[in-house]
Amino acid sequence: MLRIAQTLEAQLRAAMQQAFPEADGELNPALGPASKPEFGDFQANGALALAKPLKQAPRQIAAAIVEQLQNNPEFSALAEAPQIAGPGFINITLKPSVLAAEVRQRIGDPRLGVAAVEQAEAPVIVDFSSPNIAKEMHVGHLRSTIIGDCLARVLEFRGHQVLRLNHVGDWGTQFGMLITHLKQVAPEALNTADAIDLGDLVAFYREAKKRFDDDEAFQTTSREEVVKLQGGDATSLKAWGLLCDQSRREFQKIYDRLDIRLNERGESFYNPQLAAVVDDLRSSGLLVTDEGAGCVFLEGVVGKEGKPLPLIVQKSDGGFNYATTDLAAIRYRLGSAGDGAGRVIYVTDAGQAAHFAGVFQVAKRAGWVPAAASLEHVPFGLVQGDDGKKLKTRAGDTVRLKDLLDEAVERAQADLRRRLEEEERQESESFIDQVATTVGLAAVKYADLSTNRITNYQFSFERMLALTGNTAPYLLYAVVRISGIARKGGALDGELPERLVFEEPQEWALIRQLLQLDAVISEVESDLLPNRLCTYLFELSQSFNRFYDQVPVLKADEPMRSSRLALCRLAADTLKLGLSLLGIPSLERM
């Protein structure tokens, strides 16, 4: 109901100006959704802020505003007579005919009343997932991948040009030590594709890391190998390319399972730009040499001794680091010679907040961030086990993402087979596989997205696969229930009656919930909190279930029957759209 809210806000502001022409400054109606259904649809609190400057009681001010509103025929066409409550709140209830007209407009509209941005603005970049080459994706990559994908989907649906970037860790010292180790223990891996699988590569990486930590001669050889790689040595580059390809194929298997679309642009892409970053910082007077390292001292960030903390961009040996690469990425992403983006969103764990705050500050001070552009860090908490600690295997290892997804599907299949047996239902193996895969992966995604991303959350297969509560299976089942109406003879896509007729409180509660979709999507677009969309879909499912359990649909007389079927259709379409923005496909049967 964003359009109606904007209209009401303009009408309220005009009424305030007419009632109090002597008021200074811009008048703010302070319009928002009503805090409780009994207070109507909207509540305006602007009278309270005017009490002090006008030296009048808030209720007296509210009464004057209401009088002007009621003199406006356009307002009277939208809403019932406003009510003044409490110290001076103005409660506004929309007319039933207005709500019914809004429902009619949304039925059959693929956007369900959600407006697209008016004109194509500068691209929006969402940087997410970002695993490291030669390492398997683990549970720590789950949140970045799922949250980033959801945000990209919402922004794309709103009409933004979105560039989904996978900033993979494909460069650095680790390749020097890995290539050096493989030359000695598995040379075939450096010149033959698929000579080893990723699991073996990970094991070799661990061995190489141990040797690097323990053996000084190995360290020296590894660093020499890095120099060769950076210098464009053909043999080293071929080995590096094979290692990257091997990891890339394994990553893609995970992305395909989760229906994630990404454009890979790894750290190596920015290598040719690193020296220019340091030169720019030096020429702008920001770069300071401290103990041999090139750094920029941060403003407003001090250490234990009260001294400004540095952001190191060039090590004392002349090498570069993550900060240099991230600065080069910002410079390219926002620059007219690069992506020309207007908004860059980084989806990483909360532990990197200080790093990004420093990098963003330096980029702004260097003049690489245009006035209209924004850099946003989207932090998230840890995935924990039932013990409240970081999720680990029983052996204490990090949980591989592949294993976690496999177990989710296996558990969903076991639950489904048990339910089929209890209900004495016969279904094909292909049906069981499809439903179990959809439910299992949806449960993992939804459990993550439904939690406020800023907080940690405890991973529990039992909770996330439950058919009750704020879970993916509960939402999917609501869609299945509506699909069942069509199977029972209720044409959900039938012609609408000439006039939609709604009488029951359960109908109006569902309608008001359905009409909030555009406002919720707008909130997610600005606040980047997917749990807001999850909460909305859960409350919508609850509202639909109350309506369907308490109000006859198929057995109702006309025009109530057609009107209620239209509500069912809009509820199904809204749930399906909302789930798709979370990256979750719907099911017709479960």
Curated annotation (Swiss-Prot):
SMART domains the record matches: Arg_tRNA_synt_N (SM01016), DALR_1 (SM00836)
Enzyme class: ligase
A GO MF label: arginine-tRNA ligase activity
Compartmental location: Cytoplasm
Coiled-coil spans in chain: none
Presence of the UniProt keyword Nucleotidyltransferase in the record: no
EC numbers on record: 6.1.1.19
Gene3D superfamilies hit by this protein: Arginyl tRNA synthetase N-terminal domain (3.30.1360.70), HUPs (3.40.50.620), Isoleucyl-tRNA Synthetase, Domain 1 (1.10.730.10)
Short sequence motif named 'HIGH' region, residue ranges: 131-141
Cross-referenced Pfam families: Arg_tRNA_synt_N (PF03485), DALR_1 (PF05746), tRNA-synt_1d (PF00750)
UniProt keywords, alphabetically: Aminoacyl-tRNA synthetase, ATP-binding, Cytoplasm, Ligase, Nucleotide-binding, Protein biosynthesis
Catalytic activity: tRNA(Arg) + L-arginine + ATP = L-arginyl-tRNA(Arg) + AMP + diphosphate
InterPro entries: aa-tRNA-synth_I_CS, Arg-tRNA-ligase, Arg-tRNA-synth_N, Arg-tRNA-synth_N_sf, ArgRS_core, DALR_anticod-bd, Rossmann-like_a/b/a_fold, tRNAsynth_Ia_anticodon-bd
Assigned GO CC terms: cytoplasm
GO BP field: arginyl-tRNA aminoacylation
Assembly, per entry: Monomer.
Family affiliation: Belongs to the class-I aminoacyl-tRNA synthetase family.
Designated name of the protein: Arginine--tRNA ligase
Gene that encodes the chain: argS
